[in-house]
Each structure stands twice: as C-alpha cells, then as structure tokens.
Amino acid sequence: MMGAAFAKRDPRIAIIGTGGRGTSLLGNLLVAKAQVVALCDIVAEKAQGAGAMVVKAGQKQPDLFTNGPHDFERMLKLSDIDLVIVATPWLWHAPMAIFAMKEGKDVAVEVPGVTTIQECWDIVETSEHTGKHCMILENCCYGYNETLILRMIHAGLFGELLYGEGAYLHDLREELFSNAGEGLWRRTEHTRRDGNLYPSHGLGPVANYMGIQRGDTFSHLVSMSTPQRGLDIYRKAHLKAGDPRNAEKYITGDMNTSLIKTSKGLTITVKHTVSTPHPYDRINQIAGTKGIFYDYPARIYLDGQNKDESFEGIDKWKDHEHPLWKTEGEIAKQNGGHGGMDYIMLYRLLQCVREGLPPDMDVYDTAAWSSIAPLSEMSVSRGSAPVQFPDFTRGQWSSRPISAIATQA
C-alpha cells in the first residue's frame, strides 16, 4: 500500500457510529454531496435520526444496522459499500477497521486511530494484505492555519526545521462525567492508562510539517505524567453520595508531556490534559533556522521580516493560503465543524477517492501517530525511560514522497 492511490470512483459510504461525532461527520459529508448508503449504531434512535438527515439531503433512505455491537459485521458484508467511516469509542476502531478492509472496503477512522502497538501492526498488515486504505481522520491537519503554515514551510520560509510542539489541552471534565455521549465510555480510559491518550490533534500537523515517514521518522520518545488530581476534585464537587462513579480509581496523570526525537535529530514536544481548567489549546508550534510560528493566538516571527523582536500576525501571508481553503473555505465555515476543518478534511477525502489520488495520511501515518499513546504509557511506567518507535514502513520512510496535502488543491 506504499504510495497507492484510491480506486477512482464516487464512493458509497457507510458510517459506523451515529452519535455526536458520527452525525457531525455525516452532516459535512452530505454538504459535500457524498453518497451515504448505510448507517450503524447500537442505539436505533440515533441511527434513525442520522438516516433522516440523509433523506432530508435528497438521498434515499440508507440501510440501518442496529442489532447490537457486532451488527457492523453484517453491514460490511454488503457489496454496495466501498468506503467506511468509523466514529465509535476508541476500543472499537481497530477491529472495525480491520474487518472492513478484509471485506474489501477502504476505511477512514476517527482519532485516535488505534490504541495498542499490536493494533498498529494489525492495521498495517491488513492494509498491505487486502490492498485497502486505512486513513486517520485527523481534522487538525486541515485547519486554516495548519495548511497555510505547511505551505510556507514547503516554500522555504522557515528554513531547516528544528523543533515542533503540539498538544491537546481541553477541559473535558464535565463531558467525562456526563451520563450521555462520550461520558458513557471515555472516562473509563482514565482508569486503565497513564500517558498521552489523545496525541494526534497536536502531533499530526507537526508530523506533516516535518515530513515524518516521508524523509524522516520518529526514533524514540520519553514521557512523564504529573499526579492525577483533576477528576477526583471534580467528582467530589459534583457527584452525590452513592453514585457508583465515586468508586472509580483514576490513574491518568493530569498533564502528560512526551518528548520525541526523530532520526534526523529534530525534537517534538507533545502534551495532553483533559482533566484540569484550561482554555482550549493545541499549541501548534514549529521552529526552523529562519523563523518560528505559534498558534493560540496565531503569531509568527521570520528572520528579516520583523522590524523589532516581536511577533506579528499571519494575515500578510495570505498568499500562501491553501487552495482548498480558497475554493471551499466559505462553505466550510458555514457548515461549522471545528471552524471548518472537518468539512475541508472530508471534502479532501472525497476528492482523493473521486480523482483516484493517494490519501493524504495513509495507514503508516495512522499507525505511527497512534503509537504515541501506548509508547508514552510504556515510558511513564518505566520511570520515563526512552522507548523506541517501531518502523511501520519497514525502512521505506526515507524515500516516500511528501504528502500531497502540502501542495495539491
């Protein structure tokens, strides 16, 4: 599957998971005039509501599969489905993606793509054996700032890259203790794992900036976590006596910091916190020999461009705006989805399939970006010892071409 393109077609899409995230993706797909032919969820009412969205968009009623947690298998045996969107709790991502590929379907899977190193290898080997794609739906790679900075990097404005930093800093305490949506399953992850549980929102754009697995590769990481305090404090303040959640023991440190070294010597910091008071922030920093960019708020400093030692905004660099944002930006903003990046991501996925192009992020990226979570857990458990990255490309990272998202419309 190295460098392979999608089979050119107008895809017939099935979505597994029609909760909050699945229906958000569905809405954007319908605006992009995607064919949605089947929907699956363990809650029949959610699948029915998603089906009504499809009909309202002028398409025929999609087939619904709501007969338990394994009914997706029955759905994926249908011959008229050729692209599957997986938007379910994390532990289901790998088995659903693998089953879909074995049934001859390309897959686009929500983040984190998979959760263990074995699953990373499983999706790579299944993709190679079946000839089907497994793309990570990392929407943050399609943000306006991220795509603009990526094109500036490829124009040489940052010089040789040296350092990047990404993060997922998001106060999810209320959501984690909700009796609906992600509160039904995501909090459980905090009882099982201590590391960076959700790395790719911050890491994905930085990996694209640096050409990771396309001329460079992750070598090793060290990771450390603070004590866990936030969920205990929130629970004490908000739950009543007798609530069964009071018996849960949380082990995920409130802030995890992981430091990655690449084979070329570049360094990357990746941070994660969802259990403390914090404004939303992905940091999105990249530094090179000619300048530096930080996000939240967006600010840039390029050698010879600033009159004093101070940052400036990025408006003057609008000529590097990505072609997708030039042509689809207004539609993207009107349809929401994290500032429009969700729409751009799905529009681009459809574009790649319809034009027979390779995916911007392939199964090797899905595996490498997802591997941060289990590797960070290993390092934390070993006293922050260095942990080596597997080479999911089996040595081919040095000759793979740069992802087309950097240049293509």
How would you name each of these model-derived features?
Residues 83, 89-90, 94-142, 156:
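Beta-strand-loop-alpha-helix segment that lines the small-molecule cofactor/substrate pocket
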Residues 252, 270-280:
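Glycine-rich phosphate/pyrophosphate-binding beta-alpha loops
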Residues 258-264, 288:
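Active-site beta-strand termini and strand-to-loop segments that position acidic
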